[in-house]
């Protein structure tokens, strides 16, 4: 099986890479995704062992701040069933879940965060989905060449 690469976005005041670093075994479930295209990536394509870039959004500066790995493949997001959760989805049921999540484990925090501005300035990354107009997905695929360049920039 060919390893795939992904980028996930999180607002650091909601859940930061530092929060992940403090989590048990540096692992967490990636819940609350409520976009069908992102859900399909999680449910159908993200596989154990895939690489994940952790992106801090809605902050200054927006940056890729570290590397994670998928450690559990897509399974139903439990928050969709919890009426007290902000992610509650009343038309979903345990028998017919709509939303899915994966578990990720922190591999490392970058010494140098890779800022959105630096991504935009790098010719190797000019086609990266993250910087394409109108792309606001919280989960998106990353090409191997882009992955390698980001890893180099963050080291």
Language-model segments: residues:
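Short, charged beta-turn/beta-strand-edge "cap" motif at the junction between a beta-strand
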Residues: 55-62
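Short, conserved beta-strand edge motifs with alternating hydrophobic and charged residues
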Residues: 7-9, 55, 67-69
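A short secondary-structure junction signal
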Residues: 18-20, 80-81, 115-117, 150-153
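Compositionally biased, charged N-terminal/linker segments
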Residues: 1-48, 146-147, 154-155
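Aromatic- and Lys/Arg-enriched surface recognition patch
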Residues: 66-137
